[in-house]
Amino acid sequence: MKKLILLLIAITVISCKNEAKKESSKKEEAQEIKEVKKEKFPEELGKVFQAHGGINAWRKAQVLSFNKGEEVITTDLQSRKIVVNHSKYSLGFDGKEVWLSEDEKGTFKGNPEFYYNLYFYFYAMPFVLSDDGIAYEKVDAISFEGTDFPGYKISYKANVGTSPDDNYIIYYNPTSYQMEWLAYTVTFNSKEPSEKYNLIKYNKWENVNGLILPQEITWFKKDDAGNPTEPARPATVFTLPLISQAKLADSFY
């Protein structure tokens, strides 16, 4: 009798555990479905992110660093704290405010608030176009050397960033889904929406720990229809890329 009671208890316990596992499994599946549904970007842009290593790999990364000329630009990808180091000056964002430190006053030419994350955005394409507070709109393709490149316009909701009226348009290869062009407006000074787009060609890419990041970009001139024609200036080259899942101390920024 005692053995029978113990057996019944054991069966009950095992049954409860199995039910708990099923319930846990259902919750995990529901969570996975919920996470998929959270994505706000269009399916085509999801393919662009995938062509560049995948949005999940990007989100796991903690630190991104690269060189532009004599500047070393380092970013905490989760907080978006940034440091731009040069032999004669440093500037950045510590999570609260933009700062500038110079060996000699006037060494840095430009506006720190405008410049501190400018090249981070150009370099972190296309992944920064998955940030929160973004609206997407399919736009007409642009044409260059016989190829039409489909595009999506990216605009920001009010009070997102220092220039919420800035707009971006990403153009991608229709076959490989690799990003090819970026059109963007600048509203930092005017604080008003603009339809004047600058155009950048992403010439070369490289694999950095599984993520496909830019190695060289070139600003282009456009015709009246908005299609690229010829380079407007020499190429900008990025070197010594690093992306890591290890965080840097807050004091670094």
Predicted regions, residues:
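Flexible, processing/modification-adjacent segments and terminal tails
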Residues: 41, 100-166, 190-194, 247-253
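Short, surface-exposed beta-strand/loop "edge" segments at domain boundaries and coil↔beta transitions
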Residues: 71-76, 88-94, 105-110, 159-164, ...
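Gly/Pro-enriched, hydrophobic low-complexity segments
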Residues: 150-251
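Bacterial signal peptide processing site
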Residues: 17-19
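C-terminal motif of bacterial Sec signal peptides marking the signal peptidase cleavage site
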Residues: 12-15
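N-terminal mature ectodomain segment of secretory-pathway/periplasmic proteins
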Residues: 30, 34-107, 140
